[in-house]
C-alpha cells in the first residue's frame, strides 16, 4: 500500500530525538533501529569511525493517525552538512515502479540536485531530488513479495 512519510535528518542525535518522540507520542519503533555499521562498506567511501558506526542509518516511528516519521544521522565524514532545506524530506513510497518513475520525473523537472533512481542494497528502488521550489523528495519503491 502506498504511503507518504516525513524524513528527518540529524547530526548525530537522531536516536536521542526519536527516543523523545517515542515518549511524546506513546508509540514504538517500526522494527529495530538500523545503524551505520549495518550498511555494506563502500570501498570508495570514507572509513567510518567507531562512533559513526553506531549512529542511526534509518529509524521509523508511527505518530498521529498512522503517519510515520523516519530519520537518519548525517555524517560529517561523508561531507554532509545539516542546514535549513535538507533537514526535512517528504518520502514517497508508491505502489509500482512505473508510478515511482513518473513521480521522480515530474518532481525532478527543473531540478539541479537529484540522486537518480537506482536499485539499493535494502531491496528498494531509491532516489531523491530537490524540486524547483526547494522541497526535497525521496522515492522508495519496494516490490511486493
Where are these regions (language model features)?
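Detector for Asparagine
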Residues: 9, 13, 44, 86-87, ...
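Core segments of cupin and vicinal oxygen chelate
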Residues: 8-66
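Vicinal oxygen chelate
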Residues: 2, 31-34, 63, 67-82, ...
